[in-house]
Structures are given as C-alpha cells and as structure tokens.
Amino acid sequence: MQEAKCFQKTRQLFESPIRTSDKRARARRAGTLIVCSCVVLGMCGAFAPRGRAASGKGCTVSETNFDGWKAEQLANQWVKLEIVPQLGGRLMQVTFGDHDFLYINNQLKGQYMPPDTEQHRWFNYGGDKIWPMPEGSQDEQHWAGAGGEPLDDAPYDLQVLSHGPTCAVRLTGPVDPQIGQQYIRDISITGESPAISFHAVMKNVSGYPQTWSEQSVSQYNAASPNDPTQFNPDFWGVTPANPQSSYLNGYHVRTGNPTNSGYSVKDGLFRVHWNNMGGEVWTDSPGGWVAVVDGTTSYTMLERRKFEPTAEYPDKSTIIFFTTGARNRPGPPPAQTAQPAEPPRPPTYYMEAEVNSPMIELAPGESYAMDSQWYPTRMDSSFQGATYSGVTGTPLAAAATPNGLVLTGNFGVLYPGQLIAHFYNRGGEAIGTAPAGDANPLQPLKLQITLQAPPETARVSVHVVDTQGLDRGPLGEAFVNPPPPAPEGRGGGGQ
C-alpha cells in the first residue's frame, strides 16, 4: 500500500502543471522523487527491469507478441491489455474474460507504416490513442488531422514503472512540430479489480503559449460476434444528456445524415444505436462518463473522467461518437470502364468513443494531465445508467412481503467483493445492514434476494464492498413498497 501511494504521489507531482518560476514546486517535486524512487521503482534512479513476466500481488507486466507486433502486456485475473508502442503508443486490445473490446484493422495486423509526411496518408490500426482537439484546417489553432503526424504514427518509448501491487507502464511520444506538443501516457492496473487507469499528459514543447485539448479516442469493435462480415444490430454508445445543451436537440451531427434515427435523447441519456449509418455526433454531456454497450454479448465498457462545469471544451463538445458505415449521401454514378473492378474491401465496423479534456493554455514547458478510468463489466442493451460501483439495467426495487424484504434489480458491478444492503427508517436514520450476495464483474448481477430487514425499514440501498473492505458506493437505492406504518405519537399525533 505504501508503494502504491508513493507511486501515485510521485506521478501527480512530477506531471502536474507548474510554472517555470515556481522554485518551491520544483523543490517539492525533486524531494518527492528522491524519497519515493526506491519505494515505487524498487531501485534508486532506475525503472523496473523488463524482458520477463513479473508478477506482484495479482498483476503482471510482460513483453509479448501480439498479432505480429512487439507488445507489452498488462494482465490480472480479469483483464489483459495489449500495448504496442510502435503504433503511436496505442493500446491495441482490452480483453475482459474472453471478450475483446477494441477494433483491430485485420488488413494491417503485424504491419507498421512510418508517418507519411509527403502524401499524409493515415493508417488506421485500430485500438485506442490520444489525439489533440480542436480539429480543422482553418488556422494553426486547429489540428489538420492524423495523416503523417508523429503523435499518431511514430514509435513511442515504453518504460515499465512498477510490477506490483500496481502494474504500470509509461508511453512517451515524440515531439509533434505541427502542434508543438508531446504526449506522455501512463496506463496501469492492480490485482484487485478489472479497473484500468490512464494518466495522459500533454506538454507544450514549443517556445510560446499554446491552447489545446487532449482527446482519448477508442475504437470499439461493432462487428457481429457471430459473423464479422455483418454489423452488430444491438450495439450502443451512451452518455448523460445535457438538459441545457448548447446543441439543437441536445447533440450536433458533425458528419453524416443529420436525421440518423440511431441518435436519440431519452430518460436523461443520449444514445447512439448502431444502424450502419456512418457519421460523427458531438455532445456536451455533463455526466463525466460514457458507456459502450454490446447488447448481443452483454459486455459493457464504462469510461470515466472528471467533468469540469466551468471549463471551456473544444466547440463545447465533451463526448463524441463516430461510427463507420454508409454515409447515406448521394454520389456520382460509377464510371463505365473496361477495366476490371477492384475487389471490394471487407466491411469495417467500429464505434469510436471520444472523451475530450478542457481547452488548456500551457506556457512553454508546462503540462496538463487528464486522468480517466475504464471499467469493463456485464450489461445488455437495457442499460439505464452508471454509478461509481456499477451500471444499471433494471433499477433496484424493494418489496415488503410476509417472508421478508425482497430486493430485485439488474446490474453490472465494477469491483469484485460483496453486496451489502443498508436499511433506513422514515427519518433517514441508518438502522442496520445485511449481506446481499457476491459481486463479480464477470457475471451479470440478476438481484433477487429476500432479506430479514428491521420492520421499520422505509428505504434501502445496496452497496458494493470490494475485497479489501472498501465501500465502492451504491448500485441503487429504493423506497420500500408498501412503506412501513408511520410511528405513532410523533409530531403530536402520528402520520
């Protein structure tokens, strides 16, 4: 535990934004690095050794070959992460149980194409990466795109930061002269849960102040699990809708068909339903999370990062979805030619979930970090929302019966451990708890349990307590139906 805390403090101090004139901040940073280097890294002044699988309290870091690429694998009993530094520092795959979340371009498997600085072609390998925002070609304050850019396609340096109890690597990218930025990203897991942590740093390496947003771009595989030549008809992207949205209808269709029936706002959520109509849609979601839901397999990925309500986001967008598929725009008829037609390319099915940071002005040498977390879990297309301990399909319900208090609901949990029911009376006083079953992120939680609750119980909540005994928060909360009788004699005569 001391190692994990020291590692976190070192990372925060080392990469937090400081002014070059702040001598005290630099001194604190240097002192913390000296004190913690042996604790965090296992040796003074060096990174953890590579070249072998190293385990520590339930997680491993190892070199591997992934689909023909030299990769680094982070793994625990729930997840495997395949990181390919050569491909612009991409996280190429996240496997949860036996389910692969991310899209991989089969035509480029095992290949590497250096940045095309002449024709500016973009090579889409798939996976997950960091890009700058805003995009555009109108001035130097917009990014013209990934084609030929070092930050997207040049090799990144990889360093193993720790082998346990936190398994962490750092990816350091090249300087990108187009935007004057350098990206540095830490990716880590522990042995305690399937949660994945990201610490993405953008650093101004130019000689003048610059303002940018950094964006996590994750390509999720939207092909049918039964036939990869077909799209998955039960595939969704979900994020909280903004009730005071700056966009008409609560979202902005940037590319594609503006009347795409796959876009909807209902019950406080913006949803993208995959329907083979490609396009990009922007939202100004204030919720701080985005979920990608595969209703066919009941696997869901929840991404979280802190939303800053007073900050400026690129063109007001906080969460963006992009889907491949037909653009549904008329084009010219095919030319009549005697030349044989090229064989059609295989279909490409993926959904991008793009998470934006605020727009940040950085002086030369300054840096900014966006922290985010991924939580793989189980949930189908009944998905209705997220808490800090899980996702909800059917909300919690509590029914008083002669046999006891019956709790029901459908959830996906983010942490392994135990479910604990908390009981409250009409006055909101805590009057007891009871175990309500096990929490397993790899299994859908179909809650159906009868508990012996105190007779005055008027409200109940169900929390997830992890294997370390830490309360991760409620899955849901509900009033008991029918409610218990009101106590007599209170307030002059009962209610």
Which stretches of residues belong to each language-model region?
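Extended, loop-rich substrate-binding clefts of extracytoplasmic carbohydrate-active enzymes
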Residues: S55-F66, A71, P134-S193, N221-N226, ...
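N-terminal secretory signal peptides that target proteins for export/translocation
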Residues: M1-A27
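Acidic-aromatic substrate-binding/catalytic surfaces of carbohydrate-active enzymes
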Residues: A75-L151, F307-A338, Y350
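Acidic, contiguous internal or C-terminal segments within carbohydrate-active enzymes
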Residues: P85-Q86, V94-F96, G173-S224, D371-Q373
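Terminal accessory/anchoring regions of large secretory-pathway or extracellular enzymes
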Residues: A54-C59, K316-R490
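Short, well-ordered beta-strand segments enriched in hydrophobic/aromatic residues
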Residues: W78-I83, I196-N204, G365, L407-G409
